[in-house]
């Protein structure tokens, strides 16, 4: 029997995406200046990046990268366990562990890689199970599938659902994994309650706080610290370096024994080149600023309030988010795509999020705020969204939810 032709399969899938108007397109950014982006020769005010504290172009951060590149070169040249583990890597692991109140840390190339490494190294038996919130990030869900253990999911934020799923899988070792801040909804997981569930069910509680660290909690220590928890309740926690810290990579902090096990057995850690030391040096500078500059978080909180007050005043449906991620529900895909296009015409770049990233009927504008935005820019965005709604609502079959 002939094998399926991969080229034919790819062609068919492409035709289906075109018919569904779900083709994904990369937009090329020419230059950046703070929150402004040059795209297709036009300067747009961006409300779409994860640079929550505005550190990616901060002078001290860029200078640290340039100085380290001149000294150490463009790359680490090897994996951590050969000769790629530089002083900058060791210092960053130590500084982030100390900042978050954990005894140990391990640096990875990305959050996706780190989530895979954690589950592959810890959930290695067929009977092992990872119980997850249904809206967890794709990297957490894919990591379970790739690790080969069982995946059980509970309804979003449903603590009792998490308990039921753990009780229903008593045979092997168990991990309870949750986002801290959910990337598409902007809401925060009930970490205290989930930590109690994990303890009662003898499961390791693992929190992916990609969007929380730097923004929430004392000194920006994230969701775990904001909930009054630490290593005793959350033995492993993921911190990404490409969101509030403005760089690239990820760090897993945790108990010493767990971190040592990851360093010795996690294949995504062992068999990959370490991050460039210059990039790590930039993140070291960003961590210092994130810890020190409470004004960035204060300003961000004020801007979030400005946006939510303005959107509510005009009758928009908001989600339960007090974080820089502010989704604006639009309903169907054609509506959100038309809204995003209208905003671009008005000079704003806002991401349109649609299925399969979010459920059917839950397409949304994903507004993200930065400490670099001004109140005037936020108000101008609200005004532009109102105008876009009016324009789109007059088009056939275009009604904002």
From Swiss-Prot:
Keywords associated with the record: Biotin biosynthesis, Pyridoxal phosphate, Transferase
Binding site for substrate: 24, 137, 357
One protein family per Pfam: Aminotran_1_2
Residues engaged in binding pyridoxal 5'-phosphate: 111-112, 183, 211, 240
Enzyme class, UniProt record, top EC level: transferase
BP term (GO), one: biotin biosynthetic process
Subunit text: Homodimer.
NCBIfam families, A to Z: bioF (TIGR00858)
PANTHER family xrefs: 8-AMINO-7-OXONONANOATE SYNTHASE, CLASS II AMINOTRANSFERASE/8-AMINO-7-OXONONANOATE SYNTHASE
Name the record gives this protein: 8-amino-7-oxononanoate synthase
Annotated organism of origin: Xanthomonas campestris pv. campestris (strain ATCC 33913 / DSM 3586 / NCPPB 528 / LMG 568 / P 25)
Designated gene of the protein: bioF
């Amino acid at each position: 029997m002939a094998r399926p032709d991969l080229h034919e399969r790819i062609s068919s899938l492409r035709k289906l995406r075109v018919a569904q108007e779900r083709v994904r397109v990369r937009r090329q950014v020419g230059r950046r200046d703070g929150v402004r982006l040059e795209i297709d020769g036009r300067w747009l005010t961006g409300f779409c990046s994860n640079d929550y504290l505005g550190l990616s172009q901060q002078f001290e951060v860029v200078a640290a990268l340039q100085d380290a590149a001149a000294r150490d070169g463009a790359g680490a040249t090897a994996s951590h366990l050969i000769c790629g583990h530089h002083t900058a890597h060791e210092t960053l692991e130590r500084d982030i562990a100390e900042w978050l109140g954990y005894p140990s840390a391990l640096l990875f190339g990305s959050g996706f890689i780190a989530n895979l490494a954690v589950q592959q190294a810890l959930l290695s038996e067929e009977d092992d199970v990872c119980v997850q919130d249904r809206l967890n990030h794709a990297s957490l869900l894919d990591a379970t599938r790739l690790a080969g253990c069982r995946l059980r999911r509970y309804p979003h934020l449903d603590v009792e659902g998490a308990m039921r799923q753990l009780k229903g899988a008593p045979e092997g070792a168990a991990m309870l994994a949750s986002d801290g801040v959910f990337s598409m909804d902007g809401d925060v997981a009930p970490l205290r309650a989930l930590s109690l569930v994990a303890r009662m069910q003898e499961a390791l509680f693992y929190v992916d706080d990609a969007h929380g660290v730097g923004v929430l909690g004392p000194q920006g220590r994230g969701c775990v610290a904001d909930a009054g928890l630490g290593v005793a309740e959350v033995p492993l926690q993921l911190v990404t370096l490409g969101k509030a810290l403005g760089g690239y990579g990820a760090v897993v902090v945790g108990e010493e024994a767990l971190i040592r096990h990851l360093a010795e057995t996690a294949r995504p850690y062992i068999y990959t080149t370490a991050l460039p030391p210059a990039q790590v040096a930039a993140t070291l500078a960003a961590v210092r600023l994130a810890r020190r500059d409470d004004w960035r978080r204060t300003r961000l909180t004020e801007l979030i309030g400005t946006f939510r007050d303005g959107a509510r005043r005009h009758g928009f449906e908001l989600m339960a988010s007090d974080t820089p991620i502010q989704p604006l529900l639009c309903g169907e895909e054609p509506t959100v795509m038309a809204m995003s296009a209208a905003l671009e015409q008005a000079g704003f770049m806002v991401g349109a999020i649609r299925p399969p990233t979010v459920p059917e009927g839950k397409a949304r504008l994903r507004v993200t705020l930065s400490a670099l935005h001004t109140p005037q820019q936020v108000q101008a965005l609200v005004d532009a969204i109102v105008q876009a709604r009016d324009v789109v609502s007059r088009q056939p079959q275009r009604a904002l939810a």
